[in-house]
Amino acid sequence: MRYDPNLIEKKWQQFWKEHRSFQANEDEDKVKYYVLDMFPYPSGAGLHVGHLIGYTATDIVARYKRARGFSVLHPMGWDSFGLPAEQYAIRTGTHPKVTTQKNIANFKKQLSAMGFSYDEGREFATSDPDYYHWTQKLFLFLYDQGLAYMADMAVNYCPELGTVLSNEEVENGFSIEGGYPVERKMLRQWILKITAYADKLLEGLDALDWPENVKQLQKNWIGKSEGALVTFHLTQEGSLEAFTTRLDTLLGVSFLVIAPEHPDLDSIVSEEQRDEVTAYVQESLRKSERDRISSVKTKTGVFTGNYAKHPITGNLLPVWISDYVVLGYGTGVVMGVPAHDERDREFAEMFSLPIHEVIDDNGVCIHSNYNDFCLNGLSGQEAKDYVINYLEMRSLGRAKTMYRLRDWLFSRQRYWGEPIPIIHFEDGTHRPLEDDELPLLPPNIDDYRPEGFGQGPLAKAQDWVHIYDEKTGRPGCRETYTMPQWAGSCWYYLRFCDAHNSQLPWSKEKESYWMPVDLYIGGAEHAVLHLLYSRFWHRVFYDAGLVSTPEPFKKLINQGLVLASSYRIPGKGYVSIEDVREENGTWISTCGEIVEVRQEKMSKSKLNGVDPQVLIEEYGADALRMYAMFSGPLDKNKTWSNEGVGGCRRFLNRFYDLVTSSEVQDIEDRDGLVLAHKLVFRITEHIEKMSLNTIPSSFMEFLNDFSKLPVYSKRALSMAVRVLEPIAPHISEELWVILGNPPGIDQAAWPQIDESYLVAQTVTFVVQVNGKLRGRLEVAKEAPKEEVLSLSRSVVAKYLENAQIRKEIYVPNKLVNFVL
């Protein structure tokens, strides 16, 4: 009988499908376990083996927890709204829905071939109207809570592309796509008030079993700062407020800097400086925020022609404008303290502004007394408290907590996204759609390009945009913006609890049974955006009594990157492995050019992704699953090797041959059971500790030891096969039946460990002569002293020849020493 994974795997995948083996049920008699992957965007490129690391890990845990008696929810769906499908539609005219459905079908085929134990009955895509019906409803809930509003925002606009770009899509004032000029413009946008939840989002991190680096990234992104607002009265009419956390440096202020987009800038600028300031503002608005705040850029700026009075000394401070100050941080006004801030120092040196040192090397205030303001000798919190009290007593400032976090710009000028369910009227008012008007479907259009500045592609469908609103009896216009891709992923984990409820996004009963997600695995690239946005939505739902937990994801693991060899011709780009060869240690392209070889993250753009289907056809899914774990710790970067998959296939061949051999007998063999119980103990420990990369090596060690036994216990092998199932389910199902068990290994309980099999039955004595190690002796644990001494003499007989033993030292279960 020969191991044929292609035959076996298809057979058992069909069995699982027919028997709905992995259907999740709300069983009140069982403890629940919800294990979830960050669901994928179904791209046209399909999956490569790098994607399978996390999916294999969650599947191992799901199968293990089922075997331990848990009621397990392990679903999969599709984060299917997104820019790539829309860009493809712009190029080809193919509706994004068609492209998305085709890509989903390919993804499902790839995942099914891996034998993942998903509850397929809960599958959905975020672009399904039945799903985004509820995304729209939840947006309106946020709107009703006062957390969704419209405001003018400065955005990156590319006239050539006809669309707004994110900061990540702009570099040095040009679009990354196409290299076109980008300018900053004010645009009316939908915004979510995530800042209202800044403190709760910070506090909630403490109770989460998440990687510390992810929690720190979120803390930094929220950026809570305790400080004060300091008032600087202008020499002309008005004043400016600057936020600072370094109140101890107040007497070191020698200038103020205001952001180019500050709303009060126009009233501050003198007529003599207006043209120069206007030109500078226009120039700065062509830069992305990332470029403006870069620490490596040369500081630029223009004097506004105005001065402010120092709140303590009354000294006149020049007010400058510079693009290194951004309106979204603090108040958009920075008090320049060049002696104690690197960026301020660079600016001061560029424009020859004064530098006043007011803090010594020990952090103590110096040169900081003025009349009744006495700061010298103070430091740290004591100095901070003194300054705040002084300012507040004189109405010159007040304590203030500020956040780096800004409200979430939520609208997009895209077609392939959830239409925002709002109707606008001529008088400037608007109304949210009511329940009977949802879902709001997008119109069918032929041209998916944006419709000029401030208009999304939906604006092209005039018959869809301009309507007579029967609810109010007025003409109105539908919102032409759509939601970002993040919208659908903000709450998808809740929909999996109750995936096909047509009356509610989820029922209270099912949500309270399944939530929170017990284990969430995905890439570290989502550390801030997706994970922060979903936590925000969830906390809003919790405060409103819609969910039972304050946090959605109890434990988070970020899988490491999968690296593979990439081949690049300098100055030209990447080539595939099929187009290179190695000659005397140098890699050459088929065109004869020298190729650079690097270990880089698998990606379509680098042409180094490995198609899992190719490996499945050659080695089988179980071998691929084993190597996906064996390649390295789950949370670490790892280098991929197709040869490693072959090694796991050879192990499975040996294991299959052993279980199907004639030496397998229905007997109680202690040696075999000892090995089996030790294996169960180790695999249990590996999974509980998420040390999944050590599972294959434990099985290989077991196989090596077990194969040396004179006879193979069927009971011992059944135990081994049962604990192999989480990582290699297809071969385990097959061998389970061959060993005489009923089909459906997932219905069998995890083997119970008998501690008596884990206790050693023998002990090893160190045998010494005159204190020097001369041999070792393994005997039964209960062997009497005289027997141990007699056997020990035999072990070191050559060292005892022609010698008289003067003393025999015996340490039970450890040592025998013959003193001559």
UniProtKB/Swiss-Prot annotation:
EC annotation from Swiss-Prot or TrEMBL: 6.1.1.4
Assigned keywords, A-Z: Aminoacyl-tRNA synthetase, ATP-binding, Cytoplasm, Ligase, Nucleotide-binding, Protein biosynthesis
Catalytic activity: tRNA(Leu) + L-leucine + ATP = L-leucyl-tRNA(Leu) + AMP + diphosphate
This protein's record includes keyword Protein biosynthesis: yes
InterPro entries reported for this sequence: aa-tRNA-synth_I_CS, aa-tRNA-synth_Ia, Leu-tRNA-ligase, Leu_tRNA-synth_edit, M/V/L/I-tRNA-synth_anticd-bd, Methionyl/Leucyl_tRNA_Synth, Rossmann-like_a/b/a_fold, tRNAsynth_Ia_anticodon-bd
Enzymatic class: ligase
Binding site for ATP: 604
One CC-aspect GO term: cytosol
GO terms of biological process kind: leucyl-tRNA aminoacylation
Record localization: Cytoplasm
GO molecular function: aminoacyl-tRNA deacylase activity; ATP binding; leucine-tRNA ligase activity
Superkingdom, natural source: Bacteria
Short motif ('HIGH' region): ranges: 40-51
Gene3D superfamilies reported for this sequence: HUPs (3.40.50.620), Isoleucyl-tRNA Synthetase, Domain 1 (1.10.730.10), Valyl/Leucyl/Isoleucyl-tRNA synthetase, editing domain (3.90.740.10)
Keyword Nucleotide-binding among UniProt keywords: yes
Pfam families for the chain: Anticodon_1, tRNA-synt_1, tRNA-synt_1_2, tRNA-synt_1g
Principal subcellular localisation of the protein: cytoplasm
Signal sequence residues: none
Motif residue range(s): 'KMSKS' region: 601-605
Family from the record: Belongs to the class-I aminoacyl-tRNA synthetase family.
NCBIfam families per the UniProt record, alphabetical: leuS_bact
Name of the protein described by the UniProt record: Leucine--tRNA ligase
Name of the gene encoding the protein in the UniProt record: leuS
